[in-house]
Curated annotation (Swiss-Prot):
<comment type="function">
    <text>Involved in the biosynthesis of the iron-molybdenum cofactor (FeMo-co or M-cluster) found in the dinitrogenase enzyme of the nitrogenase complex in nitrogen-fixing microorganisms. NifB catalyzes the crucial step of radical SAM-dependent carbide insertion that occurs concomitant with the insertion of a 9th sulfur and the rearrangement/coupling of two [4Fe-4S] clusters into a [8Fe-9S-C] cluster, the precursor to the M-cluster.</text>
</comment>
<feature type="binding site">
    <location>
        <position position="221"/>
    </location>
    <ligand>
        <name>S-adenosyl-L-methionine</name>
    </ligand>
</feature>
<comment type="similarity">
    <text>Belongs to the radical SAM superfamily. NifB family.</text>
</comment>
<feature type="binding site">
    <location>
        <position position="67"/>
    </location>
    <ligand>
        <name>[4Fe-4S] cluster 1</name>
    </ligand>
</feature>
<feature type="binding site">
    <location>
        <position position="63"/>
    </location>
    <ligand>
        <name>[4Fe-4S] cluster 1</name>
    </ligand>
</feature>
<keyword id="KW-0408">Iron</keyword>
<comment type="pathway">
    <text>Cofactor biosynthesis; Fe-Mo cofactor biosynthesis.</text>
</comment>
<dbReference type="GO" id="GO:0009399">
    <property type="term" value="P:nitrogen fixation"/>
</dbReference>
<feature type="domain" description="Radical SAM core">
    <location>
        <begin position="49"/>
        <end position="298"/>
    </location>
</feature>
<keyword id="KW-0949">S-adenosyl-L-methionine</keyword>
<feature type="binding site">
    <location>
        <position position="169"/>
    </location>
    <ligand>
        <name>S-adenosyl-L-methionine</name>
    </ligand>
</feature>
<keyword id="KW-0004">4Fe-4S</keyword>
<feature type="binding site">
    <location>
        <position position="70"/>
    </location>
    <ligand>
        <name>[4Fe-4S] cluster 1</name>
    </ligand>
</feature>
<dbReference type="InterPro" id="IPR007197">
    <property type="entry name" value="rSAM"/>
</dbReference>
<dbReference type="InterPro" id="IPR003731">
    <property type="entry name" value="Di-Nase_FeMo-co_biosynth"/>
</dbReference>
<dbReference type="InterPro" id="IPR000385">
    <property type="entry name" value="MoaA_NifB_PqqE_Fe-S-bd_CS"/>
</dbReference>
<dbReference type="GO" id="GO:0051539">
    <property type="term" value="F:4 iron, 4 sulfur cluster binding"/>
</dbReference>
């Protein structure tokens, strides 16, 4: 297996200046070996997240560091963030749950161990779980997430366990900044604090990343954007991890509310705005691609990104299930998914051919309501998030997410809720939906956002490019004037998602 940095797919394109590896890379952008490893991984491939599911098993409760943005909870069903689970599992319970989920959700292709503590602070449970899953379900990709403190000690064990993807959370490479994020670490049977703790942590993280890259393990770097603490500094983090062979960089917004009980939440540290996050992601994109579709999942998440079906697979429910692992059924289902993906790409490319050469300076941002499968298949009133696409003569580029409060509640909508949604997508020219009622449609039009429902249940890329083609045509004919919709200064209470 080659080291990651030897693959030409992880270098910047001479034509575009953008990296051709990472979450937005397609079949033609990557070496065949790398493509086969990421094509059905919903975190490492942006397109795959429309079609494939993942699951996390909560077998790693202990942690060896304290983060000011984290508060682990082991019996919590109503918070959607990392470090939270409804129940802890033994390795034996975990593998039974994996089989149950894989049987029920044949597009589930990835198992991750992401807490609620740190996977490598619980090595016996973590690697026993991975071994049991490899034996019972050999087609499932294995992942783990770690803060990196113990990583150098377990790199060879990770390779032997056939873990192909590792996520490392790296929030700084400057110990003075790190001291503001981490109160303490526990290393070599001793607790360290302050700058000394942060120095040990960053050295271990970067050492572990280099070791994994040399062994061909695909590494995703998670970084939490904390305004006025590490926001400007994350550009340096990006350079450091890129030079050490990281495959993908995921800059996530700080989740900071008092009810979560984190240090940052309790002291009023704000999270970034949507525009602040996108500006930073754009600044870092180039030699490495940025992951923009992260949902900051719970440590027991199950299903497609953006949905959580973990309540269907509690330990009590799984124990009652009569499960049989049908590998051939899973292969057949996933083959149908791949055929669908090929059709989707072909449809988008055909539509894009009609836009070539048309007013290349125009770019517009649109919001899409989708439940997955790469389709415009969600009702405006039921949408809990909108996916954002930047449209240009180069195509439809996924650039982020906006989480919203559902407009429809118990069969009715409220005007104040609509105003909040419109505020959250105020920089978009249009919103694509499967269906929309008269009241929200009228409100959106008044706000200058075009509601588009004529492409219901059609492919996102094909439909948005078709709309863009018509939009550019109207501009050329003088029927409308193109105006870039800007984002006003930060509004109190702005909410964003990690993409």
């Amino acid at each position: 297996m080659q080291s990651i940095t030897e693959h030409k797919g992880c270098r910047a394109s001479a034509k575009t200046g953008r990296a051709s590896c990472g979450s937005q890379a397609g079949r033609g952008d990557l070496p065949v070996e790398i493509w086969e490893r990421v094509k059905n991984h919903p975190c490492y491939s942006e397109d795959a997240h429309h079609h494939y599911a993942r699951m996390h098993v909560a077998v790693a409760p202990a942690c060896n560091i304290q983060c000011n943005y984290c508060n682990r909870k082991y019996d919590c069903a109503n918070e959607s963030r990392p470090g939270v689970v409804s129940e802890k599992l033994t390795p034996e319970q975990a593998v039974r749950k994996v089989i149950a989920v894989a049987t029920t959700i044949p597009q589930m292709t990835v198992l991750g161990i992401a807490g609620p503590g740190d996977a490598l602070a619980n090595p016996a449970k973590t690697f026993k779980t991975l071994a049991l899953v490899t034996e019972a379900a050999p087609d499932i990709k294995l992942c783990l997430s770690t803060n990196g403190l113990a990583l150098p000690d377990y790199v060879d064990t990770i390779v032997r366990a056939k873990v192909d993807h590792v996520t490392i959370t790296i929030n700084m490479v400057d110990p003075e900044i790190g001291a503001k994020i981490y109160p303490w670490i526990f290393f070599n049977h001793k607790r360290y604090t302050g700058i000394e703790a942060a120095r040990i942590l960053t050295n271990r993280q970067l050492q572990g990343l280099e070791m994994l890259s040399e062994r061909g393990i695909l590494c995703k770097i998670n970084s939490v954007m904390i305004p006025n603490i590490n926001d400007d500094h994350l550009v340096e983090v990006n350079k450091a991890v890129t030079s050490r062979g990281a495959f993908l960089h995921n800059i996530m917004p700080l989740i900071s509310v008092p009810e979560h009980g984190t240090a940052f939440g309790l002291n009023g540290q704000r999270g970034p705005t949507a525009q602040e996050l996108k500006t930073l992601q754009d600044a870092c994109e180039g030699k490495i691609n940025m992951m923009r579709h992260c949902r900051q999942c719970r440590a027991d998440a199950v299903g497609l990104l953006g949905e959580d079906r973990s309540a269907e697979f509690t330990n009590d429910q799984v124990m009652k299930m009569d499960v049989h692992y049908d590998l051939e059924m899973r292969k057949a289902y996933q083959k149908r998914v791949e055929n669908e993906r090929v059709s989707k790409v072909a449809a988008g490319q055909k539509e894009l051919a009609g836009v070539s050469g048309e007013m290349s300076a125009i770019t517009v941002l649109v919001a899409v309501a989708t439940k997955g499968s790469g389709l415009i298949n969600e009702h405006f009133g039921h949408a809990k998030e909108f996916q954002l696409y930047e449209l240009s003569t180069s195509g439809a580029k996924f650039v982020g997410l906006r989480r919203v409060e559902g407009y429809c509640q118990a069969g009715y909508g409220e005007e104040d809720r609509l105003s909040v949604i419109m505020r959250d997508i105020r920089d978009c020219h249009a919103v694509f939906v499967a269906k929309i009622g008269g009241c929200p449609k009228s409100g959106l039009i008044k706000a200058g956002i075009e509601p588009v429902d004529q492409f219901a249940y059609e492919y996102i890329e094909k439909s948005t490019i078709a709309w863009f083609r018509a939009y550019v045509g109207k501009v050329k004919r003088g029927e409308i004037q193109h105006v870039q919709r800007g984002v006003p200064p930060r509004w109190p209470g702005d909410r964003i998602s990690a993409a």
